[in-house]
Amino acid sequence: MTELARLKFYATQPHSCSYLPDEQATTLFLDPSQPMDVHVYADLSEMGFRRSGDHLYRPHCQNCNACVPARIPAARFIPNRQQRRILKRNADLTVTAARPAFKEEYFDLYRRYIETRHADGDMYPPSRDQFSTFLVRDLPFCWFYEFRLAGRLLAVAVCDLLPNGLSAVYTFYEPDEERRSLGRFAILWQITEALRQDLEAVYLGYWIKNCKKMNYKTQYRPIELLINQRWVTLN
């Protein structure tokens, strides 16, 4: 483990929670002057931290612990019948790793995805600056995985390649290809890629029991939840 005790962290003032409208949220951030070291990041991911843009953070709320870090142990994952169908349905896609960059092709897909799927969220309306600040970061461990059908871009999974696993930062995809279940397929592909690279887990961020948008995460079994500073398996 990295000497995490030497790191500095800062907490935000309470603000409206993005997921539970009746709650106030507080976020703990790693000191932004701390270099984004991949080993520090990996150690912090074991403690429930996530990356957004150039920042590592985790919830630090006074009166709520609803946000539970979740990860899929790649070697123990077993796809269910629906997931096997999704894998078969998307077997015609090719996946290519690319360095983070701003491309109109990426932004057009991102814009249509946000406008169609998340028009009620805090990422609407999408903008080029928002896209770049959130996703296009010059970090050596960050990758854009492009999912294409005969050259046509259908999805992009933004992932961080860490020593202990893949951290799924964000996925955006073609909203008109609903039958393909591209968001679910992207997670299934990342599990397969983690296995191929002999990585321990795919980190999915936070699961919130009373948030419908988070329900999909527990469809991948077994899944591990960070409870009382221990990763506990949910079969």
UniProtKB/Swiss-Prot annotation:
It comes from the Bacteria. The gene is bpt. Its EC number is 2.3.2.29. Belongs to the R-transferase family. Bpt subfamily. HAMAP family: Bpt (MF_00689). It catalyses: N-terminal L-glutamyl-[protein] + L-leucyl-tRNA(Leu) = N-terminal L-leucyl-L-glutamyl-[protein] + tRNA(Leu) + H(+); N-terminal L-aspartyl-[protein] + L-leucyl-tRNA(Leu) = N-terminal L-leucyl-L-aspartyl-[protein] + tRNA(Leu) + H(+). The keyword Cytoplasm applies. InterPro entries: Acyl_CoA_acyltransferase (IPR016181), Asp_Glu_LeuTrfase (IPR017138), N-end_Aminoacyl_Trfase (IPR030700), N-end_Aminoacyl_Trfase_C (IPR007472), N-end_Aminoacyl_Trfase_N (IPR007471). Functions in the N-end rule pathway of protein degradation where it conjugates Leu from its aminoacyl-tRNA to the N-termini of proteins containing an N-terminal aspartate or glutamate. The keyword Cytoplasm applies. Keywords: Acyltransferase, Cytoplasm, Transferase. This is Aspartate/glutamate leucyltransferase. One of its GO terms (cellular component) is cytoplasm. GO terms for biological process: ubiquitin-dependent protein catabolic process via the N-end rule pathway. One of its GO terms (molecular function) is leucyl-tRNA--protein transferase activity. It is found in: Cytoplasm.
